[in-house]
Amino acid sequence: MSDILKKICDVKVEEVAAAQKRVSFTDMRRDAESRVLTRDFVGALRAKIDQGQAGVIAEIKKASPSKGVIREDFIPADIAQSYAEGDGKVSAACLSVLTDRQFFQGQPDYLKQARASCPLPVLRKDFMIDPYQIYESRAMGADCVLLIAACLEDGLMAEMEQFARSLDMAVLVEVHDGAELERALRLQTPLVGINNRNLRTFEVSLQTTLDLKKEVPADRLLVAESGILAPVDVHTLRDAGVNAFLVGEAFMRAPDPGRALAQLFA
């Protein structure tokens, strides 16, 4: 695990402990199980792909540890609506909302605001290290959760996937290398995210996805993450058979994120 990732995960351990003092595991689970039906995250991606379009998970992200504040004019509901509308022809399939406070200046309310403003399924983008966070995610309205292989040992990762599935939530498992991919493929989820950013060096290379794609079975839906900034990046990946993408920074820097999405994936 990289130094920054370890630092983040250590903070998460403290955050979860504090959260459980405010709301017990039992109460959080009860709240999660009482929520209305989830939106079909995987189905939304596949529907776009079946139409010949890219399945885009559009990210709502105010800041990052490496770039600082990315978007000053940050209104999650407006951004979500913009993504859902696109240019009228090309639009997002799903949303991803950062809820981490300390490192990404996110918060759970951003997810709630985004989901309430449009019909798209929503991924909670955070660093999951404890089953409590799965129930917490559903309680705040998430339809999908992110499990980062580098943060989790196999048994805990499988357990957290099962908790998510019991709540009818989708799981996006994220990897960066072959060893992590091998571990991720033991899970049942069809969603496999390949992060082109090396979390140790923060260097980004699309070659990561191109190399690992060969090892992803046809029944899994590969999602390319990070480093997708220009149409040439999209064309490179789509020519290699990649049809689903998670993109944030390229859109967050644009005045109209939805139109920026439509232009990138035109």
UniProtKB/Swiss-Prot annotation:
Enzyme's top EC category: lyase
InterPro entries documented for this protein: Aldolase_TIM (IPR013785), Indole-3-glycerol_P_synth (IPR045186), Indole-3-glycerol_P_synth_dom (IPR013798), Indole-3-GlycerolPSynthase_CS (IPR001468), RibuloseP-bd_barrel (IPR011060)
Residue intervals passing through the bilayer: none
Enzyme Commission number(s): 4.1.1.48
Reactions catalysed: 1-(2-carboxyphenylamino)-1-deoxy-D-ribulose 5-phosphate + H(+) = (1S,2R)-1-C-(indol-3-yl)glycerol 3-phosphate + CO2 + H2O
Keyword tags: Amino-acid biosynthesis, Aromatic amino acid biosynthesis, Decarboxylase, Lyase, Tryptophan biosynthesis
Gene3D superfamilies associated with the record: Aldolase class I
MF terms (GO), sorted A to Z: indole-3-glycerol-phosphate synthase activity; phosphoribosylanthranilate isomerase activity
Pathway it works in: Amino-acid biosynthesis; L-tryptophan biosynthesis; L-tryptophan from chorismate: step 4/5
One of the GO BP terms on file: L-tryptophan biosynthetic process
Domain of life: Bacteria
Database matches in Pfam families: IGPS
Entry's family note: Belongs to the TrpC family.
Record-linked HAMAP family: IGPS_B
Protein name: Indole-3-glycerol phosphate synthase
Organism: Acidovorax ebreus (strain TPSY) (Diaphorobacter sp. (strain TPSY))
